[in-house]
Amino acid sequence: MIRIQPYSSYWVLIFLFLIPFGKVFAGWNSFIVNFDKSLYGKGTQTWQIAPYDDHWVYFANKNGMVQFDGNVWTVFPMNNFSDVRSVLASTTQKRIYAGGINEFGYYEPLDDGELVYHCMSDSLGDASRLLGNVWGIHEADNILYVQGDDRVVKYLNGKYATIEMDAKIDCSNMVNGILYIGTDRGVWVLVGNTFFPLQGADSLASNRIRGIIPHKGGGVIIVTAYDGLFYCNGRTTVPFTTGAEDFMREN
């Protein structure tokens, strides 16, 4: 069975509490399909999932970037054979971006559909290349953002810019064209090439952040490691109650 790691478990829990349950229960018999790990490359850890064009699904897996076309599973390793931590299926670039450990790049199809890997991190300087775990890859306005353990790399028109953060970055998300990062010092946003604390979220400055999710009414839902969920609209931050706070803290 595909094993979703702790970072991803927060997203699964939130998904379950925000979707309309009636629809789920109505189609429960076909909602979950189980695939044994022997089918998809025996990598027991899967970190992210990215669908593409209603035909393929891509997985950031311990053994590499995994592709599933509805019938066949194919594993594509990175150059350094590290775990793949993140995956982004870009319909604008027609590429599958993947991030591992101190490496990121993209897979692009040849005329016959075969995916070929192109390493991008090899173009960085030695110091900038020490990204650690690449937990997030995002794109907005033709800019690619690659989130490592303590820095973000921006890529535009063949040029790279590295923005370091004086904190451990645990997660990131692109919301309405703005890159949010969750750290062990609260939530920050990237403006140009500078990180700024998220306005209205000062109360979370000492919290470790595990997830940042757009809210349908504007603002973001912030997932903390130990204190549950919060809603921030850029002015104030309040607890976001689901009724499952105790369960999330224990799990």
Predicted features, each with a name:
Residues M1-N251:
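Carboxylate-rich, polar loop motifs that coordinate divalent cations or form catalytic acidic clusters
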